[in-house]
Amino acid sequence: MSKSLLWDDLEYPIQPWIRSAVDVMGFENMTPVQAATIPLFARNKDVVVDSVTGSGKTVSFVIPIFEKIVQEEANTTKMKKGHFHSLIVSPTKELAKQIHSVFESFLEHYPENLYPIRSQLLVGTNVKTVRDDVSDFMENKPQILIGTPGRILDFLKIPSVKTSMCSMVILDEADRLLDVSFLKDMENIMNILPKQRRTGLFSATITSAGDNIFKTGLRNPVKVTVNSKSQAPSSLKIDCAVVETDKKLEQVISIINNYKFKKCIAYFPTCHSVTYFYSFMQYLLKKGIIKEEIQIYSLHGKLQTSARIKTLETFTETISNAVLLTTDVAARGIDIPDVDLVLQLDPPTDPEVFLHRCGRTGRANKLGKAITFLTPGREEDYIPFMEVKNINLEEISLDIVNLPDNFYEIFKDWLLEDRARLDQAVKSYVAYIKTYSKHAASSIFRLQSFDYVGLAKFYGLIRLPKMPEITKYFKEDKENARTFGEGWLIDPPINMDKFGYLDKKKEDRRLADLKNLKSIHDKKKLKSELKKKNMSWSNNTQSKEEKVERRTKMALKRKRIEEELSKEADENSSGDDEQNRDWKQVILQNKKSKNSNNGMQGSFDDL
């Protein structure tokens, strides 16, 4: 790109306070995407921006929005009550909050003597309702709204909220907003907003949105693409390692114990997995198996909004040796400073998310490393699969260092302390398999070649759960069926009736349920025995006599038929053995003849 990256070389002079803000925030020069996008958007062009993660896309729309608001205020285009100027939509609460914080960071440098510019965050929480958001909106009169699709749609439906003065709309991580999860809400939002507006779509993987981008009301958009041989920034090194399924957790712990990093994000496949492994890793911290200076946090979509925001803030503020266990809720757009290591225990089910996960490190030209685990065999085909998408994975070899040889025994002992941990492990196991079965690259990630036993050990399970996939697996794999036929992974098996919960209320409820089930079982067994016991002697004798009588009658009938057939054969015999007929064949022919007559009778009756 031939454009100058100096702020002073922009086609128009930006506001002095904005220039001051970018200097204080450390943006010495523009990134290529900023140099291309800011002038276009400021000149009232719709834009579709496709650029690698960490390339500064957020600032590309923040500055033009501020410029337009200041310009319109200078032209005495005052914002009426209940109206707003700009709307920014993001797929997650965490990303929305981050964008809001960027706007607020710029506003810290806004002159107090000018007309006030304000922004408001619109995300669903367990504290604030939509009515609360509307009340704040009417009182504070913000020009800029940032939020998630569901909350924004509910907000815009309130009659006191007016949309006719909205002149700029941004879809950050647009490909995610335009997929099936959010498309309906986004269409409804776009229908509420005025047609005469500027629209900007921003993402590192915008091409995956396909024709859905035309549903956003774009008018003669300009596409901004920062040319690169790879989809990943040059500061990001993407590696992969072949790791046995049951060794993945040990490998993660080995890496965070021995690798020098400030912040690490470890991606797990499901919310259940994050919760489960967070508990176990806290236990390993206390045991000294994970180094004491390491701080571990958990974040996933099923946490309450307040807990998610607090966790993200704490992780962001931590200086070093911080590890965040998370799901794809933290895969897109979130810019956490000093993340220099990303671990993926499995590739994401959607290949488009792969680069977003890796892109949490190596941002703003800072060096970063991302490592993805692949299991031996078919999953190794993921490397050439990603090469087609211009993402090069370099295969590396990893060793498990300074961990106890009896790691699985430690895991098992921890699990056996509380039945609630087993429940969580089973939920995590089942959720993992369901997620794995939905992988977009289904030719690579196949349940037919899946390591069910290895996954069970990965979760520290003592017994394989009962589920259709495992039943089918054992039918096809006779060797494992013999080894794990009863599902037990430990020897000797434990008495599940005596395996209880640490929580007294849960345990009391379990014992009551167990007693009830035992009572039902005993009643059924007793009923069956009483039925046999109470059957009269005369009935038993009569039943036996009837059986003998039936057998006698059948024997006499068979003998009579044989005699008749023998007599018929003697009368019609021509001396040729081939014409002698077996009496069984005669009976069969008689039956066929009888059936044929019955069929004929039926057809006549239908006339």
UniProtKB/Swiss-Prot annotation:
Residues 529-565 form a coiled coil. GO terms for biological process: assembly of large subunit precursor of preribosome; maturation of LSU-rRNA. Gene3D superfamilies: P-loop containing nucleotide triphosphate hydrolases (3.40.50.300). Residues 527-607 are annotated as: Disordered. It holds the Pfam family CTT_SPB4. Residues 248-404 form the Helicase C-terminal domain. It catalyses: ATP + H2O = ADP + phosphate + H(+). ATP binds at S51, V52, T53, G54, S55, G56, K57, T58. A motif (DEAD box) lies at residues 172-175. GO terms for molecular function: ATP binding; ATP hydrolysis activity; RNA binding; RNA helicase activity. Keywords: ATP-binding, Coiled coil, Helicase, Hydrolase, Nucleotide-binding, Nucleus, Ribosome biogenesis, RNA-binding, rRNA processing. Residues 543-552, 560-570 have a biased composition (Basic and acidic residues). Residues 587-601 have a biased composition (Polar residues). It is found in: Nucleus, Nucleolus. It is an enzyme of class 3 (hydrolase). The keyword Ribonucleoprotein does not apply. CDD domains: DEADc_DDX55 (cd17960), SF2_C_DEAD (cd18787). Its EC number is 3.6.4.13. Residues 38-224 form the Helicase ATP-binding domain. It comes from the Eukaryota. Component of pre-60S ribosomal complexes. Belongs to the DEAD box helicase family. DDX55/SPB4 subfamily. The Q motif is unique to and characteristic of the DEAD box family of RNA helicases and controls ATP binding and hydrolysis. ATP-binding RNA helicase involved in the biogenesis of 60S ribosomal subunits. Binds 90S pre-ribosomal particles and dissociates from pre-60S ribosomal particles after processing of 27SB pre-rRNA. Required for the normal formation of 18S rRNA through the processing of pre-rRNAs at sites A0, A1 and A2, and the normal formation of 25S and 5.8S rRNAs through the processing of pre-rRNAs at sites C1 and C2. PANTHER family: RNA HELICASE (PTHR24031). This is ATP-dependent rRNA helicase SPB4. It comes from Vanderwaltozyma polyspora (strain ATCC 22028 / DSM 70294 / BCRC 21397 / CBS 2163 / NBRC 10782 / NRRL Y-8283 / UCD 57-17) (Kluyveromyces polysporus).
